[in-house]
Amino acid sequence: MVTRYLLAAAFAALSIGTASAAEPPPGKVTVVFDRPIPNIPGKSMKGVVVEYGPGAASPSHTHPKTAFIYATVLEGAFRIKVKGQPEKIYHVGENFVEEPGSVHEVSANASDTEPARLLAVFVLDTGEKTLVTPIKK
């Protein structure tokens, strides 16, 4: 009887570990710059540092429809897929852009053992507060 309970507890622990392993941990986003662009009324530039631990990823998402985004990898490597484009891995010093209205289908650390960090610079409407909107499944 005790053996049956121990086996049940072991299977329960394994299934909990498997369920949590299916969802990668989220990343951390820190705003490092936010300023109106003086010669373009109504537009601002906002810089954010995106940090992913090993194996971390963000769910599919969009950014504000007015946002043009330039990103450069500062550390590690990022696996990126924007709708309509092939998935690609970007390494330190490489960069990419996201056009206004793009759907960011994949944003993940390309490594399961090393952290990754990038700087993303948004040009967007002044006063826009929501930088990321998850896509509902």
Cite the ranges covered by each PLM segment.
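Bacterial N-terminal signal peptides
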Residues: 8-17
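Glycine- and acidic-residue-biased ligand/ion/polar-headgroup-sensing regions
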Residues: 65-84, 92-95
